[in-house]
Amino acid sequence: MPSFDTVCEASMVDVKHAVENTTKEITTRFDFKGTPAAIELKDKEITLTGDADFQLSQIEDILRNKLTKRSVDVRFLDKGEVQKIGGDKVKQVIKVRNGIETELAKKIQRLIKDSKIKVQAAIQESKLRVTGAKRDDLQAAMALIKKDITEVPLSFDNFRD
């Protein structure tokens, strides 16, 4: 029975390279000289450190540009709150989304059921598997998901015929 998986995964290699390129640019830019401006990637969290909110926004802008150049959708980034870490330094943690949240998976599942396309959607941990009898039905389901779900960057993997 034909099937495909709907996933929400960023290429962590490209994210790592974008963070490294951002670090290089921070060290060479004149307006960041002598400041504690830094960016760091640990697991799936990017930590921005700087003197003020304005500096954090500049670092984030550089990061977004580098991610865009590497074809990583910036909707993968989930910004946290700006925290004061002593003195006049601030930091912000940005999480890189990986996997479809349960709430979104249920929304997609409901969307597919309501569309009356002859496919079934099953939630499997951080992805959503869609199965159907015909390949055309699966392609219609893909088109429906792409059209209606725009808040997160979804991709389709593991298409089996």
Curated annotation (Swiss-Prot):
GO terms for molecular function: nucleotide binding. SUPFAM superfamilies: YajQ-like (SSF89963). It holds the Pfam family DUF520. Gene3D superfamilies: YajQ-like, domain 2 (3.30.70.990). It comes from the Bacteria. Keywords: Nucleotide-binding. This is Nucleotide-binding protein Rfer_2692. It comes from Albidiferax ferrireducens (strain ATCC BAA-621 / DSM 15236 / T118). The lineage of its organism: Bacteria, Pseudomonadati, Pseudomonadota, Betaproteobacteria, Burkholderiales.
